[in-house]
Amino acid sequence: MKTALTIAGSDSSGGAGIQADLKAMTMNCVFAMSAITALTAQNTTGVSGIFEVSPEFLAQQIDAVFTDIRPCAVKIGMVSSAPLIETIAERLRFYKAEHIVVDPVMVATSGSDLIASDAVRTLRRELFPLAEVITPNRHEAEVLSGLHISGRADMSAAARAIAADCGCAVLLKGGHSDTDADDLLTFPDGTEIWFPGKRIANPNTHGTGCTLSSAIAANLAKGFALEEAIARAKAYLTDALNAQLDLGRGSGPLDHTLGGVGVENWMHGVPDAVHK
């Protein structure tokens, strides 16, 4: 069985963070493991507290995983401080980790800040160069590129700037658009691939970014090329949104079980182009 590791924060409400990561990875048929960067007191209405682990303890968790069940892919989510980012980068370089997906989580769905401003610079310097792909949303891409994004041309310019600066592929997510959910994959050489997506009428989007990046990592772990891994991950996320789970008083979580259909039934429904 293929394996994947998520390095991210814990969401006490279960909708985002490592909880969403583990669910998404499991539904995409890999053995999922975790190293926790922080505990958050969080629900669908906001984040009321963040308790970081120490860099030393984070390193211990990563060591425990790599020295026993080596992950075939690694997803990195919420890392709120520079020392933790530096620790992750050092350990991943030491173990020569493969198929690294970085979701540069900066703001929760509820609007709460999740990363210190100085940590963004460290993220760019230490982790992005190790990544196979990073998965910013529109707001995160604006921070990383310094450009305002209001349409497809802006998405293209921002993604090209980030990819050239960081030396890795960039999947700029279009889910914050008012008209569609098209995502743009851009490589450092300027090659672009658009992934069309249908906007789903569902206000409950807590954990969508975590879910997508974890599903991408899971499919990279299974040996799919990046473009294919993204297509499969988008298909899974779309179905999780379409399940229309409605929990909590704010922006609620996704249904990672896809309405209880089970992974085998879901996989039978994935288009042939995605299976191949």
Across the structure, where does each feature detected by a protein language model lie?
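Phosphate-handling active-site elements
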Residues: 29-33, 193, 219-233
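Conserved N-terminal subdomain of the carbohydrate kinase-like
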Residues: 2-6, 18, 25-110
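Nucleotide and nucleotide-moiety/phosphate-recognizing core
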Residues: 83-96, 168, 182, 188-191, ...
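Short pre-catalytic strand/loop immediately N-terminal to key active-site residues, enriched for Gly-Thr
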Residues: 7-13, 192-206
